[in-house]
């Protein structure tokens, strides 16, 4: 699923979140939540 919401600098969708700032700036993209860039990734 695509991370389509930006809250507090984090891209949030379907229980996952990604930091938009370096060094995890590539965490969220049109393909969704790229977990390997996100140490704090959460799933439903």
From Swiss-Prot:
Highest rank taxon of the organism: Eukaryota
GO molecular function, one term: toxin activity
Modified residues annotated as 4-hydroxyproline in this record: 23, 39
Main location: secreted
Tissue expression: Expressed by the venom duct.
Cellular compartments annotated: Secreted
Comment field on protein domains: The cysteine framework is XII (C-C-C-C-CC-C-C).
Function: Mu-conotoxins block voltage-gated sodium channels. This toxin reversibly blocks voltage-gated sodium channel in cephalopods, with no alteration in the voltage dependence of sodium conductance or on the kinetics of inactivation.
Keywords from the named record: Bromination, Disulfide bond, Hydroxylation, Ion channel impairing toxin, Neurotoxin, Secreted, Toxin
GO cellular component, one term: extracellular region
Modified residues (6'-bromotryptophan): 17, 36-37, 43
Cysteine disulfide partners in this protein: 3-16, 11-28, 18-33, 27-38
Record organism: Californiconus californicus
The name this protein goes by in its record: Mu-conotoxin-like Cal 12.1.2h
């Amino acid at each position: 699923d695509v991370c389509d919401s930006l809250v507090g600098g984090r891209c949030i969708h379907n229980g996952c979140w990604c930091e938009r700032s370096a060094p995890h700036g590539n965490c969220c993209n049109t393909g969704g939540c790229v977990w390997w860039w996100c140490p704090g990734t959460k799933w439903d």
